[in-house]
A protein has these predicted regions:
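Short beta-rich binding modules
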Residues: 1-135
Length: 135
């Protein structure tokens, strides 16, 4: 593996600005069927991107940033609550619904992504996906 190079010393790096809470059009760029390390529950992990064209006019994401990337985990146990959440996720992206879902069907599809401000593990504010909705 090669060395990672940066234009400035990473010791001087500051936390990036957080995308403000709101609704943005975004696209699913990757989808994976996984098992949660902490609980052992099956889940669908979606990688969602919001392009800079959707950012508020007064939001400066920093030099060279053309999109914000988020991860959405949808627990997929075969219980009523998880089936309901999966239904709403499929509906948001226009993915066909049946008793089996192909994660690949999400890739390339768009939805409204509702961003909220949560906290990271160190209690710092962090933009995160609160909900996905149909366009």
């Amino acid at each position: 593996m090669g060395l990672l190079s940066f234009s400035s010393n990473i010791a001087d790096a500051e936390a990036p600005p957080q995308l403000p809470a709101g609704e943005y059009k975004g696209v699913c760029t990757a989808a994976q069927d996984k098992v949660a390390a902490s609980s052992g529950n099956p889940m669908l992990t979606l990688t969602l991107q919001i392009p800079s064209s959707e950012f508020p006019a007064d939001f400066d994401p920093g030099e060279g940033v053309d999109a914000q990337t988020f991860t959405l985990n949808v627990v997929s146990r075969d219980i009523p609550a998880d089936r309901w959440r999966m239904k709403n996720t499929c509906k948001a992206f226009g993915v066909p619904m049946s008793n089996s879902i192909d994660p690949n069907d999400f890739v390339g599809r768009e939805a409204r992504i509702r961003i909220r401000i949560g906290q990271d593990l160190e209690k710092n504010p962090r933009a995160e996906v609160g909900q996905v909705l149909p366009l």
